[in-house]
Amino acid sequence: MDRAVSQVALENDEREAKNTWRLIFRIAILFLTVVTLAISVASLLYSMGASTPSDLVGIPTRISRAEEKITSTLGSNQDVVDRIYKQVALESPLALLNTETTIMNAITSLSYQINGAANNSGWGAPIHDPDYIGGIGKELIVDDASDVTSFYPSAFQEHLNFIPAPTTGSGCTRIPSFDMSATHYCYTHNVILSGCRDHSHSYQYLALGVLRTSATGRVFFSTLRSINLDDTQNRKSCSVSATPLGCDMLCSKATETEEEDYNSAVPTRMVHGRLGFDGQYHEKDLDVTTLFGDWVANYPGVGGGSFIDSRVWFSVYGGLKPNSPSDTVQEGKYVIYKRYNDTCPDEQDYQIRMAKSSYKPGRFGGKRIQQAILSIKVSTSLGEDPVLTVPPNTVTLMGAEGRILTVGTSHFLYQRGSSYFSPALLYPMTVSNKTATLHSPYTFNAFTRPGSIPCQASARCPNSCVTGVYTDPYPLIFYRNHTLRGVFGTMLDGEQARLNPASAVFDSTSRSRITRVSSSSIKAAYTTSTCFKVVKTNKTYCLSIAEISNTLFGEFRIVPLLVEILKDDGVREARSG
């Protein structure tokens, strides 16, 4: 029995010994595993250049720098994306739209002409060079941010003169009128053979042409058709407009002085004429006894007309028959426009009294001098469906020469400053159902005209006078919402005398550096301006057709002054040679 017990005890001791060594082995293996893992982690961290806790302080700064780099990269990429979007979504469709508009204008013109050919009135297809597609009759400079007067005219550029000049000392060329459509331009002026003061006989020069680009890239005006209306008729105060059928012209016919005409009892004879693309001219008398039944004198505004909604629109003015319905409806109506930062010191009641009297100047026998707008349907029949709009004198000043302009989708009426208000005026105009509505005007305080006292260039109070000179502004710079910001024009930079023609860009209060024709003593008169763009080069040009003193051959020579519109912040003046 003792042996059996000893055997059992021995087996137990052996089992315990095995368990002990097994435990020691397991502990050793676990220890080695932990050590190996620690060494591996340390090696890995070392190989990766891991930071110690003390190094972790700079991590937020590094993250911020990395974030800035990423943001900058994304920003530059966004600029590229924005440019791509602007090109693809905005500029390309606009360019296509401009091209489409020009093509549609040409097709419309052709359709009119083909219909005319069917009626034996001849037809042709003049059109500007492709370089000008989308650059005529458009908002040429769209800029919300730049100072308007940072744009300025270059020195006058040499180009082909498309305007005939007098050929004798007694010859006189006066009263230029110009209009340009997407397909062609029209120009006219009056020619008097025996001095500019002769009112009894004259002839009218009328021309149709297109814009071309020379092989060296220069702009020039190419006359395709022209005619001298040298007959027994005495056309005066003519306005011209480029329409799908050619050059439509509105003229009055008179053999008496303006003062005598205003003292007569019947309206002035008026004709609607057209120079077709075939070079033939036709005209038709308007029924002035019906159209101007309340008027004693009526004249076109001299400035160009505009083709809008299948009709041609002209500015007209003249004298109303006292106590006629048209005269009575204007009784007591007036408007006072004020100079920028230079208000009239007179008592308000006195200003109102003078403003009312300004519509009835003594020079024309106390007749009310009224502004109006005439629209005529454009068809192969001349003088078709004429409609006269007489705006209220709560908007317009005393009637005067003027011009209808269309730029983009906006229409304007320029009114010469013949009354007391010297700064240039552009009335926004809307058309509907053959009639026009004028709205409160844009005024350009630095774009003044000379005038006799008390209505000189610096005048600031209402007064009764007939003075000034025709110097129209052309809408040049717009906000993106199509609101007008600035204009180009050639003013006469004098206080009372018609001297010193100077071209500039104007905003509502100031002007850019100017380009002078010559010294301040040079005599000048009417100016009319039109701007356009050579789309191929993205260069904007402005043409000012100006009456400049020409003592050797006639009193005036009509000169087409061409400038390029430049941009910078300088204030120097440019002068033509």
UniProtKB/Swiss-Prot annotation:
Compartments where found: Virion membrane; Host cell membrane
**Variant or mutagenesis effect after changing L224A:** About 97% loss of the fusion promotion activities
User: What Gene3D superfamilies does UniProt report for this protein, alphabetically?
Assistant: 2.120.10.10
Could you list which ranges are Intravirion topological domains? 1-26
Protein name as it appears in the record:
Hemagglutinin-neuraminidase
How is the protein disposed in the membrane? Single-pass type II membrane protein
Organism from which the protein derives: Newcastle disease virus (strain Chicken/United States/B1/48)
* Result, substituting I133A: About 80% loss of the fusion promotion activities
